[in-house]
């Protein structure tokens, strides 16, 4: 079973507890790292542990050092898209979308960054309607992009 790691922007209580109540193993940022730990430091450690990173509305694609941390460490990074919604609503959508998320993870090799969207209309979350999952970037896409300039590739020191 996949284990998940929640970034600090998902909070310590509501989001992880909702996932746990629904049978998902969850590790919370605050239990493993200092609150001010830079993302580029904890991302590789979380990836080494095999945990899937969950974050909310985080634009890691536009922060080169964080993007490199994901791609160079073979992290699996799910960005939960929700705008300005409560963590509990993101958690409900995650649980509703769990089957699609698990399928996506099984079908995509690490590293990757994917977005988990809420259903349309958003009221579907409360009715149990699943959202969707979309790949935003994988390793090959990163290597081809100018965002990888200056960072080592696999097999390079």
Task: Outline where the language-model segments fall.
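Charged phosphate-binding loop/patch that engages nucleotide di/tri-phosphates or the phosphate backbone
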Residues: 103-157
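Short beta->alpha connector loops at strand-helix junctions that form conserved
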Residues: 30, 56-57, 80-82
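N-terminal intrinsically disordered, cationic/polar leader segments
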Residues: 2-3, 12-13, 17-21, 25-27, ...
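Mid-chain, well-packed structural core segment of small domains
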Residues: 61-100
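Conserved BB-loop
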Residues: 25-39
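Alpha-helical segments flanking ligand/cofactor-binding loops in enzyme cores
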Residues: 43-44, 68
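Short acidic active-site motifs
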Residues: 14, 37-42
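Acidic, metal-binding active-site segment of PIN/NYN-like and related structure-specific nucleases
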Residues: 39, 50-66
């Amino acid at each position: 079973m996949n284990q998940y790691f929640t970034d600090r922007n998902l909070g310590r209580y509501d989001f992880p507890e909702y996932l746990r109540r629904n049978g998902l193993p969850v590790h919370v940022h605050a239990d493993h790292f200092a609150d001010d730990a830079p993302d580029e430091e904890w991302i590789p450690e979380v990836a080494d542990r095999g945990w899937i990173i969950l974050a909310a509305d985080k634009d890691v694609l536009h922060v080169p050092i964080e993007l490199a941390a994901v791609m160079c460490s073979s992290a699996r990074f799910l960005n939960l898209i929700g705008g300005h919604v409560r963590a509990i609503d993101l958690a409900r959508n995650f649980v509703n979308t769990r089957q699609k998320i698990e399928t996506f993870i099984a079908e995509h090799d690490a590293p990757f960054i994917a977005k988990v969207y809420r259903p349309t209309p958003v009221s579907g979350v409360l009715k149990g309607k699943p959202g969707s999952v979309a790949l935003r970037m994988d390793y090959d896409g990163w290597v081809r992009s100018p965002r990888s300039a200056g960072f080592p590739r696999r097999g390079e020191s």
